[in-house]
Amino acid sequence: MLTIYNTLSKTKEVFKPLDGNKVRMYVCGMTVYDYCHLGHGRSMVAFDLVTRWLRKSGYELTYVRNITDIDDKIINRANENGETFDALTARMIDAMHEDERRLNILPPDQEPRATDHIAGMHAMIQTLIDKGYAYAPGNGDVYYRVGKFVGYGKLSRKRIEDLRIGARIEVDEAKQDPLDFVLWKGVKPGEPSWESPWGPGRPGWHIECSVMSTCCLGESFDIHGGGSDLEFPHHENEIAQSEAATGKQYANAWMHCGMIRINGEKMSKSLNNFFTIRDVLEKYHPEVVRYLLVASHYRSAINYSEDSLRDAKGALERFYHALRGLPRVAAKGGEAFVERFSVAMNDDFGTPEACAVLFDLVREINRLRDSDVEAAAGLAGRLRELGDVLGVLQLEADDFLRAGAEGKVDAAEVEGLIQARLKARADKNWAESDRIRDQLTAMGVVLEDSKGTTTWRLAD
């Protein structure tokens, strides 16, 4: 029985889809003005994990993740680059998809782009105006009337009165209330724009997600996800817009993943500790980065550091060493491990406990590998099967363990030295065997002897 922590209720709840076995999930995607940073990677991996487990559990999932392809940041960056906004976004979308592919992230079922849904935004804005939840002051903008929506603050637990007292909001004479937010922005010189009933302009950020989610999934759906930094004001505003327009509950459950911290500090460009996914993948194997992002609980903050990446690499090496040398066969046995893994994942996608189960499974594989190869191979298949839920352990063991060797050592030379060492050992020429081992160690190669065979990997 799956339970999910619902940010709306602030409790774990038994997950019950609105429509039988069908699950509809919407996740706020990228604003594509730059390369994806590590925080984007965290969200991508977190909801990829949710996707994999829901499908593994037998649910019929429709996963929608949007692309924000018109925004102040996009316009500013395109102007800086001297290119059109759509040329910039096309490049960044291609780069985002490449980052996802390298991190083994399954593509969403639908990936709507804001600029393809302008007509739907016009329709929802007009509905809000007709119901008294929005107003057009005549300057080309349209604003949402926050004070009219009775449930405002129910997601973030913020009170309108407190927001008014504590907010340092830029004064806008066109607003009836400082808390009102923009639904449609009147055109400005040099900016892209679309025709609308209120004059040319472009949509506000919040209305984009309300329209794309309900267009793809209906007026009410099961799960809405995103980073914890989006809880307020973005997701709060989505609820206000959508529920005022439809009169129905917007999303049944809200899921928010934690942030990335760099050596214990918030990641930011001002602190000079800002990393794109591409930056990190230049130094570390993609599976190491993915394991770092998936091994912590999705609601927890992740501390990104050289130590945490070394720990992730070490964990994967333990897994792949257990798989190494065993025939690749279908999963067999280990039902108790499967049950424990399922219990962990059904408890709000508890990956730390799930990973602990994998380590226990590795110990059992290593215990059996010399005495019962068939049983060990069946459990190795089980390890790969469970690892696939986390999006890891699908490579050939040698390919992972030797990753990074290209350009650092000559694999053919290493293999030749290993064969020479095996001959020296067979001839009981221990001095020559030790000399070759020392030579390989100096090359950064670690040897592992087992039953007359020797395998190798690069040292950390």
Swiss-Prot record:
Span(s) of short sequence motif 'KMSKS' region: 266-270
One example of a Gene Ontology biological process annotation: cysteinyl-tRNA aminoacylation
SUPFAM superfamilies according to UniProt: Anticodon-binding domain of a subclass of class I aminoacyl-tRNA synthetases, Nucleotidylyl transferase
An annotated Gene Ontology molecular function: ATP binding
Record GO cellular component, one term: cytosol
Cofactor(s) named in the record: Zn(2+)
Keyword ATP-binding assigned: yes
Reactions catalysed: tRNA(Cys) + L-cysteine + ATP = L-cysteinyl-tRNA(Cys) + AMP + diphosphate
Family, similarity comment: Belongs to the class-I aminoacyl-tRNA synthetase family.
Complex and partners: Monomer.
Name of the protein: Cysteine--tRNA ligase
Organism expressing this protein natively: Pseudomonas putida (strain ATCC 47054 / DSM 6125 / CFBP 8728 / NCIMB 11950 / KT2440)
Gene of this entry: cysS
